[in-house]
Regions:
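Short beta-strand micro-motifs in enzyme catalytic cores
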Residues: 6, 18, 81-83, 98-100, ...
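N-terminal strand-loop-strand
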Residues: 83-125, 130-131, 159
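Conserved hydrophobic/aromatic beta-strand scaffold that supports enzyme active sites
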Residues: 9, 66, 84, 101-103, ...
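The catalytic Nudix box helix
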Residues: 126-161, 176, 184
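Short acidic-glycine loop/turn motifs at beta-strand connectors
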Residues: 12-15, 106-108, 182
Length: 240
């Protein structure tokens, strides 16, 4: 049975209230656990939004149980949208961490894709990173691409394409396309294992052969690559 310390009000749509319940390890329910990455592309926009909100709120509650001022356990308030300290009466709210993700292309219309050091051999995606304190999103694009692969970006070429909440743990991904002013790359050894410049023909042939696997269609990276590609990507090219 859900109580006010385990139920989260996700929102109201057409007079229907949507509620998420945080389960503990001792629950009698035997759920089938799947990740948002696994099912996101199959859900409706409403269900995706609800799932993202539930994941973001539940993660925040699990990692911010104590008051940062006095250390006491805080209580869930505002139907799950805040936590309040019983001693200080201070209310704490979920925080969102901005991050950029960018499809870098060159003057030959090739796209720059990278494989992170902890990914399988054929997994490739666009470059991404967190926006630092006091930094604009545009400056973060230039810095992250320079730090991760040693490529310089033409700042005036930046084009904002859209955003996606990504609750792992609390990111808001801000998607861009950008023109590289240099093409020679040097991957950051602690983050990037491999980098490739790919034409549209090379991308399709390597994806068809299995040499390359792209992000899940539920991820904004898929849509950034698709924007550069100029037509719908083959769903079979995804890593699943």
């Amino acid at each position: 049975m859900a109580d006010e310390q385990s139920a989260l009000l996700l929102g109201i749509d057409s007079d229907h209230a949507y509620i998420a319940v945080m389960l503990d390890e001792n629950t009698d329910v035997a759920p089938l656990w799947v990740t948002l990455r696994d099912v996101g592309a199959q859900l409706s926009p409403l269900d995706v939004g609800l799932a993202i909100t539930a994941t973001a709120l539940a993660t925040w509650h699990n990692t911010h149980r104590y008051c940062p001022q006095c250390g006491l356990t805080t209580q869930i308030s505002d139907a799950g949208w805040s936590r309040t300290c019983p001693k200080d009466c201070v209310t704490h709210f979920p925080r969102t961490e901005p991050a950029i993700i960018v499809a870098v292309h060159d003057s030959e219309e090739r796209i720059l894709l990278g494989r992170r050091t902890n990914w399988p051999e054929n997994w490739y995606s666009t470059l991404a990173g967190f926006v630092e304190a006091g930094e604009s999103c545009e400056a973060a694009v230039v810095r992250e691409v320079r730090e991760e692969v040693g490529v310089e970006i033409d700042l005036e070429s930046l084009q904002y394409l859209g955003s996606q909440p990504w609750p792992y743990p609390a990111s808001l991904m801000l998607g861009y396309s950008a023109l590289a002013s240099t093409t020679e790359f040097k991957p950051s050894e602690d983050e990037i294992a491999q980098i490739r410049w790919l034409s549209r023909e090379e991308l399709s042939s390597q994806c068809e052969s299995g040499i390359l696997k792209l992000p899940n269609p539920a991820a904004i990276s898929w849509h950034l690559i698709e924007h550069w590609y100029g037509q719908p990507l083959n769903p079979e090219w995804t890593r699943g």
